[in-house]
Amino acid sequence: PIEDDLAKPAIDSSTLNTPSSPDLYAHARSNVARLTIAQALSGANAVVVYATAAIVGNALAPNHALATLPISIFVVGMAACSLPAGAIAQHYGRRTAFLAGTGCGVLVGLFAALAVVLGSFWLFCAATFFGGAYAAVVLSFRFSAADCVPPDRRPRALSFVMAGGVFAGVIGPQLVTLTMNLWPPHFFAGTYLAQAAVAALSAAVLSGVRLPVPTREDMAGGRPIGVIARQPKFITAVTCGVVSYLLMNFLMTAAPLAMRMCGLSQESANLGLQWHVIAMYAPSFFTGRLITRFGAHRVAAAGLALTGLS
């Protein structure tokens, strides 16, 4: 089975430099399976936020111009918590960072539900910040999967976790559709409570991940960030990331609210976002081959062109 392949050592442990290296891949199969499931569950967090936050913001905001502020705060939370999440993983291990992130996932669901019940716009904004912190941790799942398997198994491990992202694109919108009317008249309150439950389930899955805590030797060395940031390739990559993420957020933020204001149902808005997220993750299965054949610059340019056309 494919899962068994992930657990097989790709190289003789005697060729490795560190004594702990033979144990590095001992739980490869279990780790990749858990990270894939967690990606599907935790990845639904961002989808729920994008599907509902602008609509809830429009209903709760003191001024309709602030309707999309909760999603902006979600993005700020993701950016602000990326480095702290990395620091926690570096000093205390990735599983600790994962559980801290899923803890934020539970909080966003509980606080958002309370905000809807109380009609508090600013509490809802605070909730989406925790959602951003949760999303920052979820972004690291794929890298953790790559690090916990032998080098020649990494593409397959990444494919598994990215497949979890495709499932997240289905779970998130369907979660909204199935739960948005569970607590009338508090529209979406049931959705946020369900989101908290899904985050707790993800925490239970991630609690079984067995990744080694980094040693001092692992944390030592490396180039200063200032040296890296001055490289043209780094600047190009960051610029492409900023532009593409800005445009993607613009589309994902406005689309659900615009669809509702055009008279379409919430179910239709959820379905539109579902296909958007599936299209985000599904190409990951063959993007690597395209980069190998055409080069990263051409593939990045094609991606920006597609975003512009959309």
Language-model segments: residues:
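Juxtamembrane intracellular "pre-TM" segments in multi-pass secondary transporters
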Residues: 12-29, 211-239
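Pair of pore-lining "gating" transmembrane helices in MFS-fold secondary transporters
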Residues: 25-58, 230-251
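Short amphipathic helix-loop junctions that connect adjacent transmembrane helices
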Residues: 52-64, 253-272
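Helix-to-loop junctions at the C-terminal end of transmembrane segments
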Residues: 81-93, 180, 283-296
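C-terminal ends and interior cores of transmembrane alpha-helices
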Residues: 103-118, 306-310
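Cytoplasmic helix-loop-helix junction between adjacent transmembrane helices
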Residues: 127-163
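C-terminal membrane-cytosol helix-exit motif in multi-pass small-molecule transporters
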Residues: 176-177, 196-216
